[in-house]
Regions:
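Core catalytic alpha/beta fold that binds nucleotide/phospho-ligands
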Residues: 1-184
Length: 184
């Protein structure tokens, strides 16, 4: 979802739970509030009732009965992933800061470009989507997850000798990745 709406316009499209209202009140930046609301608009358009979404202690969204979920938003874009198997999604604006933190997520065995901000952001998105999907505390992105960009816009990620599919895309100055827990 390309977030072009004003916060009030997004809010008017939704009937928010008290929990959502409380969370919104605690968000300082308008871009964060708009991302939060855009995710809920996406959920509504996918017929996922907002009041049936719960959060684990580490912040992972889930439904007691229903599909697996993952959400992400960054400045002007929001994304959701819904699946019958665990999924993870991440969208990020490509920023120079990624170069400074690369050592925290680049694994020496990654088969990925790391020579540009865009390439590093693509890699970060895949690893962050994997982290959201796996949801195991203590995962070290630079040691526990490896990534192989096998083909244009898709590849395989590995965690504990299990392989998972991922898909990624980039546009203007954004990157997005989707991971799916399907053993190959």
């Amino acid at each position: 979802w390309h977030i072009t709406e004003e916060e009030a316009n997004l809010s008017r499209q939704l009937t928010l739970t008290q929990n959502c209202i409380n969370r919104l009140k605690n968000m300082r930046h308008s871009s964060h509030r708009k991302g939060f609301l855009a995710v809920r608009c996406l959920l509504r358009s996918a017929n996922i009732p907002i009041h049936k979404i719960h959060y684990s202690t580490d912040g992972k969204p889930y439904m007691k009965q229903g599909p697996f979920l993952s959400f992400s938003h960054s400045k002007h874009f929001a994304a959701i992933a819904i699946g019958n198997v665990p999924v993870g999604v991440d969208v990020e604006q490509q920023r120079d800061k990624i170069v400074r933190i690369a050592k925290k997520f680049v694994n020496p065995i990654d088969k990925a470009r790391t020579d540009t901000v865009a390439a590093l952001t693509d890699l970060w998105c895949v690893k962050e989507a994997m982290y959201k999907m796996i949801s195991v505390p203590g995962i070290r992105l630079n040691k526990d997850i490896s990534v192989d960009f096998k083909e244009y816009q898709k590849g395989m990620a590995t965690y504990k000798d299990q392989s998972y599919h991922f898909f990624h895309d980039s546009w203007s100055d954004y990157s997005c990745a989707l991971t799916i827990k399907e053993k190959v």
